[in-house]
Amino acid sequence: MKVTKSEIVISAVKPEQYPDGGLPEIALAGRSNVGKSSFINSLINRKNLARTSSKPGKTQTLNFYIINDELHFVDVPGYGFAKVSKSEREAWGRMIETYMTTREELKACVQIVDLRHAPSAEDVNMYEFLKYYGIPVIVIATKADKIPKGKWDKHLKVVKQTLDMDPEDELILFSSETKKGKDEAWGAIKKMISR
């Protein structure tokens, strides 16, 4: 997909702040520091629309980005970061759950995992949550450039097994450095929004 327009619309914490207009939405979820912002920026060919941070757990709101006036990307707060208070974590959990379970415009969730490591307990919980609520999911295994090509299949197998992935769900190898998987990711997203 050729992106000619991409900008942040709103950072929301409650449903009344979500944008109107009925555009399809793709949520992006992943552990803090998994490379979510880099994934968004490389998909839309922008250096810093989604702010990348060396401080994990920085996104504490649902950030809605409009893409080509056709769809919204919704950047969800990173999960699994220890330096955040329990009450903050619970508040984020409620905010994410409310959005994911009630938003009619939500077409799918892109769950981003780090190819270098087996998915964490939080990754597994997130995947199970999405499956439980019947939210279509695309799993992106990022940071592929950090692993020798010959080991990709082995690492992808670990991701599939740890998440106990539904064979119907797409698993895409991705690198924001080399742009590997960018076309496949857009292809999967387009399929979801046209359903």
UniProtKB/Swiss-Prot annotation:
Keywords: Cell cycle, Cell division, GTP-binding, Magnesium, Metal-binding, Nucleotide-binding, Septation. Residues 22-195 form the EngB-type G domain. Coiled coil: none annotated. GTP binds at residues 30-37, 57-61, 75-78, 142-145, 174-176. GO terms for biological process: division septum assembly. The keyword Magnesium applies. GO terms for cellular component: cytosol. It holds the Pfam family MMR_HSR1. Mg(2+) binds at residues 37, 59. InterPro entries: G_ENGB_dom, GTP-bd, GTP-bd_ribosome_bio_YsxC, P-loop_NTPase. It comes from the Bacteria. Its cofactor is Mg(2+). One of its GO terms (molecular function) is GTP binding. Disulfide bonds: none annotated. Necessary for normal cell division and for the maintenance of normal septation. PANTHER family: ENGB-TYPE G DOMAIN-CONTAINING PROTEIN, MSS1/TRME-RELATED GTP-BINDING PROTEIN. HAMAP family: GTPase_EngB. Belongs to the TRAFAC class TrmE-Era-EngA-EngB-Septin-like GTPase superfamily. EngB GTPase family. This is Probable GTP-binding protein EngB. It comes from Bacillus velezensis (strain DSM 23117 / BGSC 10A6 / LMG 26770 / FZB42). The lineage of its organism: Bacteria, Bacillati, Bacillota, Bacilli, Bacillales.
